[in-house]
Amino acid sequence: MIEVVCNDRLGNKVRVKVNSDDTIGDLKKVLSAQIGIKAEKIRLQKSYSIFKDHEIHDGDGLELYYN
């Protein structure tokens, strides 16, 4: 299990635990269940790269945007 921290820059920091072999889509589904927003409306970013099929590691901090 890995833990990822998602910050939406509006004061919400969400810690999500997922398996290391889960995809970004699985991460979005778990995240949407925790914050109550549809998974299709979530965009995960770090700096200027948007995460679609990238590899994430334990303890990564991602920026959370709503489309």
From Swiss-Prot:
Protein name: Ubiquitin-like protein 5
Source species: Dictyostelium discoideum
Localisation per UniProt entry: Cytoplasm
UniProt entry keywords in alphabetical sequence: Cytoplasm, Ubl conjugation pathway
Gene it is expressed from: ubl5
Major localization listed first in the record, in broad terms: cytoplasm
PANTHER family in UniProt: UBIQUITIN-LIKE PROTEIN 5 (PTHR13042)
Pfam family, one: ubiquitin
Species lineage: Eukaryota, Amoebozoa, Evosea, Eumycetozoa, Dictyostelia
GO biological process: mRNA splicing, via spliceosome; protein modification process
GO cellular component labels: cytoplasm; nucleus
Superkingdom of origin organism: Eukaryota
Annotated Gene3D superfamilies: Phosphatidylinositol 3-kinase Catalytic Subunit, Chain A, domain 1
InterPro entries: Hub1/Ubl5, Ubiquitin-like_dom, Ubiquitin-like_domsf
Residue span(s) of domain Ubiquitin-like: 2-67
GO molecular function list: protein tag activity
